[in-house]
């Protein structure tokens, strides 16, 4: 027997990853989950009867509401980069999987395997990946392993509001990828309807309310904020963090501050530049990790990089940490 619930009743407390701070419990109400199901269906064309490979367990919780069958692969979901791709391919082929939600690390493993072994997964028509920027070469490898009408989607959002925006492999032109490599940031696509997304002036302080004068024009980098049906309103028993993460417009509408720096381009596409808290504040202005690191990550022999700031904010010196390919300990 289903319990009779009301839209504003608390349905769950979902914790943030804690990758950039202390994990916080996000209060989800029934209306948030209902809106997420509707937005996922409409944004990605998910239909009842599909089969999902659950490499990311939290997304699998949506499968019954979306009418999808769940296939659980043999892997450690907390360490997606260590997944055995042969097991993933076997599960996809055995159960005719149509949908896969995986981290960028898992897609890199699976895409590389399919490329090296010339494997095509004819039933896999949709791949979703979130949690971090997905490299262009990873998207290309996965696209090659899918049927011609298959698409790789990279939704952008957070536990507090998901999905916020999305871009698919069909829209990832060579020009966009080149822009990322040249330091423009990562294009995360158009806002997912009916979300409203804006760019707020950068500040580390609480913003109780904002007006038009606090919003930035096209091309200017600020903090990404969003208001929509999946925008949650509080953290569990964390009043101070809630105050920092939420704001209201002149009409009293609630908005969530993503804590991410970004901007809109002339085509209305949203670009991610990096975490606001990880920006390097120099005497000449701010530097954003995703923009800077992408330039150096494209250099042959470089595995990954990390931009950090040394010194007091406003006078920091930028330092780039570089990890090279195939470094072996001796």
Residues of each region from the PLM?
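Conserved pre-ATP/AMP-binding loop-to-beta segment of ANL
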Residues: 1-15, 22, 45-50
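Glycine-centered tight turns that cap/initiate beta-strands
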Residues: 9, 123, 148, 301-304
């Amino acid at each position: 027997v289903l319990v009779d619930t009301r839209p504003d009743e608390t349905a769950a407390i979902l914790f943030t990853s804690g990758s950039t701070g202390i994990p916080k419990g996000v209060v989800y109400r029934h209306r948030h989950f209902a809106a997420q199901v509707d937005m996922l269906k409409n944004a990605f064309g998910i239909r009842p009867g599909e089969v999902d490979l659950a490499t990311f367990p939290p997304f699998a919780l949506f499968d019954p509401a979306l009418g999808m069958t769940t296939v659980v692969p043999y892997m450690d979901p907390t360490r997606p980069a260590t997944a055995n791709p042969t097991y993933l391919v076997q599960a996809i082929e055995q159960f005719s999987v149509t949908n896969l939600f995986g981290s960028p690390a898992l897609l890199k493993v699976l895409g590389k395997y399919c490329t090296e072994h010339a494997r095509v997964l004819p039933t896999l028509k949709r791949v979703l990946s979130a949690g971090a920027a997905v490299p262009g070469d990873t998207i290309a490898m996965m696209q090659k392993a899918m049927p011609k009408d298959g698409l790789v989607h990279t939704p952008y959002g957070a536990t507090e509001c998901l999905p916020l925006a999305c871009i698919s492999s069909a829209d990832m032109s060579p020009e966009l990828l080149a822009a990322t490599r040249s330091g423009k940031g990562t294009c995360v696509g158009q806002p997912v309807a009916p979300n409203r997304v804006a760019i707020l002036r950068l500040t580390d302080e609480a913003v109780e309310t904002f007006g038009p004068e606090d919003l930035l024009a096209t091309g200017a980098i600020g903090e990404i904020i969003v208001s929509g049906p999946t925008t949650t309103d509080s953290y569990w028993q964390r009043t101070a963090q809630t105050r920092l993460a939420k704001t209201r417009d002149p009409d009293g509408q609630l908005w969530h501050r993503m804590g991410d720096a970004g901007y809109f381009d002339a085509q209305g596409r949203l670009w991610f530049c990096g975490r606001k808290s990880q920006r390097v504040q120099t005497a000449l202005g701010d530097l954003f990790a995703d923009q800077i690191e992408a330039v150096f990550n494209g250099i042959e022999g470089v595995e990954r990089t990390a931009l950090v700031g040394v010194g007091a904010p406003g006078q920091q010196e930028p330092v780039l940490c570089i990890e090279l390919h195939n470094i072996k300990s001796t």
